[in-house]
Each structure stands twice: as structure tokens, then as C-alpha cells.
UniProtKB/Swiss-Prot annotation:
Name of the molecule in the record: Large ribosomal subunit protein uL11
Post-translational modification note: One or more lysine residues are methylated.
InterPro entries: Ribosomal_uL11, Ribosomal_uL11_bac-typ, Ribosomal_uL11_C, Ribosomal_uL11_C_sf, Ribosomal_uL11_CS, Ribosomal_uL11_N, Ribosomal_uL11_N_sf
Pfam families xref list: Ribosomal_L11, Ribosomal_L11_N
Keyword Ribonucleoprotein: yes
Keyword Manganese on entry: no
Described purpose of this protein according to its UniProt entry: Forms part of the ribosomal stalk which helps the ribosome interact with GTP-bound translation factors.
Gene3D superfamilies given in the database record: Ribosomal protein L11, C-terminal domain, Ribosomal protein L11/L12, N-terminal domain
Species annotation: Streptococcus mutans serotype c (strain ATCC 700610 / UA159)
Source superkingdom: Bacteria
GO terms (BP aspect): translation
Amino acid sequence: MAKKVENIVKLQIPAGKATPAPPVGPALGQAGINIMGFTKEFNARTADQAGMIIPVVISVYEDKSFDFVTKTPPAAVLLKKAAGVDKGSGEPNKTKVASVTRAQVQEIAETKMPDLNAANLESAMRMIEGTARSMGFTVTD
């Protein structure tokens, strides 16, 4: 019989840099997870994606065991990296802070495809373009 899920914890942690310090420690401690076990396993699994923020969904079972699924980095993080900026615009409709090409948008959409609710690459690209526009980026050909 399958184990019963008691709790689901969602976090965004820098790849390879999970530590028992806040915010990771308290969130896992409340769920009753072995914090050191999680941090070691997460860091080992994400070591190749250094510098990225990785969303993780942790399923906690009744016997306090856990497993977790790592997702692709958020579109905003990938767009900022592609454009070479630290943050988006405070006024996206007035102030444009950077531009990304359609080729960069396509590359990001291909990376994000497993986590996006999109039927094909074209609709995934439109989602990423919308995120870029809401951050104050222009999308150029």
C-alpha cells in the first residue's frame, strides 16, 4: 500500500546551497523532516545548476519520510540571466530595462516546457514573452 502524504512543502532554494538556516530549516522543521538529510540530497541533486534558483516540492509522509521533486528555474530568473540584469523594471509599462531576442525566449521556453501548462512550443514562448513584458523587457526579433 502507498504511503499517505501528510504535508506538501514548496520552496525556492538556490541550487546546491540548501542549508538548515532560515528559510529552509524552519519550513522543514515544522513538517518534521530530517533537515540535514534533505539539504544533503538537494545539494547533491542540484550541484550542476549552480547560480539558479530551483523550486522544489517536498512530499512529507505520515512516517516522516519524504521525497522531493525539483522543477525548472522560474521564467523570471532565466529571463534576467539572458538579459544580463539584476532585476526587472519597477514600472514595466513605462520604463524598459532590457531586451531579449525571440531566440532567447525560445531557448527559455524549451527549458521550461516540462513545467509549463502549454500544448506546444509556440504557446510556451507566448507565456515567456508575457513574463518578459511584465518585467519591463522588450522582446526583439
